[in-house]
Amino acid sequence: MEKKKRRWGDRKDGVLLRDLDGMHFITPLIYPNRCDNEAYIRETIDLTNMNAYLKKKNESETEFPYTMFHIIVAGLVKTITLRPKMNRFIANKNFYQRNEVSMSFVVKKQFADEAAEALAVIHAKDESNVESIHEDLRHQILDCKDVHKVDSSTDNMDFFNHMPRFLGKFLVWILTRLDIHGWIPASIIETDPYYTTCVISNLGSIKLNCGYHHLTNWGTCSVFCIIGEKKMSP
């Protein structure tokens, strides 16, 4: 994505859109919260061609096989790269164009109910493809599964959790005020999953159907994607 010189009103993670039509200018003014005006879409996809593609790719990839999840992440990156309006977000009642395409998801350190979780983020490039995204996912997932490591977002949350409750609430309130004006630290934007283009939840990995998930008032996430279980269909 082409980098533009930062101007007054821009954020660390996005460029203020100054040429909106009247409808898009007024929308964030009459819906004060990010979750007040959402759209939900559910799609059923024939995986025949994807399964054949995965079989071919995995003939030479045995250490970290390609999966449906990897292909869907790559498809989301490609779609949003080609349709940059999907990568807009609202903050402080203004529309912004995000500076990059990024994806976030939760990784279980072990496949067990009581196992710890880690938060992973990948930052895509204009030239990203299935192979490069697969490599990014390999790095993130293997790193997150290391039981001796704690990801940045979890580490930050633990930091607040160990404080006296009143102090933690006060500091989070300060962060929300900073975010309204685009002053939140860049370190949070780079690692917090709710500051990415899309949060992905692979419920199919635990045999659940696809559900719906709202956006959050915290952060700037533009899309929330749920992946359901694969099933045979006539």
Model-predicted regions and their roles:
Residues 1-234:
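C-terminal catalytic/motor cores of large multi-domain enzyme assemblies
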